[in-house]
Every structure is written in structure tokens, then in C-alpha cells.
Amino acid sequence: YGYNIRSWTRSISGSLFNQTLYYQDQLEGNTPCYNGNISSVLWKAGPSNNESGYRFTYDGLNRMKNAIYGETNSLSVNPNRFNEQITAYDKKGNILGLLRYGQTSSSEYGLIDNLNLTYDGNQLQAVKDNATHSVFGNGMEFKDGANQTIEYAYDKNGNLTKDLNKKIAVIQYNLLNLPSQVIFVDGNVIEYEYGSDGRKLRTAHVINGVTSITDYCGNAIYENGSLKMLLNEA
């Protein structure tokens, strides 16, 4: 990690991922920020030397308004393909409207999410997606899986206990407020086990009545009793 004179994170360097954060630094097309807001970010991942990134703009209350995508160190190649725009906030600072852009076909890019969000206090109650296009291939987008006034529920600690957009009927928690069981509307279940320090030790997926077990032992991950992978810093 690299830092500037204000101790703000400036860069992350590794064999598989590199990232540079810009604040008041000049990068073509950005608006320098002297208050700690990030004005731009560049990154590259894997063996590729191709850089991608975003320029950011903020409103008068330092709330993000736009994330403007581009490629190369000038962010001038393939511009706007994966832009994001926050269209409105409520008085508490909660996001009310969000536009996301992405790949809509093998050669086209456009709007993939047009989200309207409603709240009870600061707790999200429902999300409606008015976008007409879906993301291409295996890209990520919001999946509008429900059309109800209340699509999310919470317990007294503020933990999420229901998410109808993800088809989750019930989420149960242990005494450490860590999720212990997730029950889906189709009857499938995910169960979690933890150590006394909160570290996750086991995950059990029960899918169509068939159980698969994943155990976490330090940097070793086992699936159904067989070593699956060893985690290490490349």
C-alpha cells in the first residue's frame, strides 16, 4: 500500500492487482478534490496491462453523483460503458434513485438498472427496477425478483431477515449477530457454523435435498471432506 502526505491511501500494488487513487491529483478530465473525496481511480487486474477506471463527481454535500467509466490512463477509451449515476437522495442521505449502465448485447452497452428505492427510516423497504434491458451474459445487475410494498424485513438489531428480491424467506442469526441459516422460498437452505471468535468454520448448502459441506481450516478449504484449494498471497 502507498499513502500520500495526508496518510490517504494512494495506491495498492500486487502481482495480480494494481490500483491508484486520485484526490487533488490532476488526471485528464477529473475535478481535483482537496477534502478527501476520491476524484478518480485506475486499476488493472491479472496479467493484462490494460487500465480501467472511473472519474467521480459529488454534490454540495459531498455525496457521490456520478461514476464515469473509461479505459487507459486517460479514461478516454470505451467511455461511459459502465457508468453509474445517483439521481436523488433523501434528507437522511439514503439513495432514492440509481442508474447503472453495462453490456446489453455482444456489441452494445446501455442502461441495465433504473432503480427506485424506498425506506422506512434508514431501512430499505423495497427496490423497483424500471430498466427495459438486461445485462448480457453473466454480467452483474440488480434482479428485481419481487413487486411488493415491503420486500425486506429486519430484526430488532437491524439485521436483514428477509429479501424477497433474492428469494430469501428467512435469515436467522446467532448471538454474535452472524447469519446462521438462510432459508429460500423454494425450500433450499444455507447453514453456517462459526468459532467462538466469529470465524466461519463451515458452510452447508442443502439444495433439492442434497447437502454439500464446505469447511474452512486456516488457509485450507475442503469440500465434502476433500481438499479444494489452499489460499495464499500471490
Residue ranges of predicted features:
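Buried hydrophobic residues that stabilize the cores of well-folded domains
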Residues: 1-3, 28-29, 84-86, 95-97
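Beta-turn initiation residues at beta-strand->coil junctions
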Residues: 1, 5, 11-16, 40-47, ...
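Extracellular/surface-associated beta-sandwich interaction domains
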Residues: 66, 81-84, 91, 181
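Short, surface-exposed coil-to-beta transition loops
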Residues: 50-52, 82, 112
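Short, ordered secondary-structure scaffold segments
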Residues: 19-52, 58, 118-166, 210-234
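Short secondary-structure transition motifs
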Residues: 5-14, 91-119, 172-234
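Short glycine-/Asp-/Thr-/Trp-enriched loop segments that recur within the blades
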Residues: 74-82
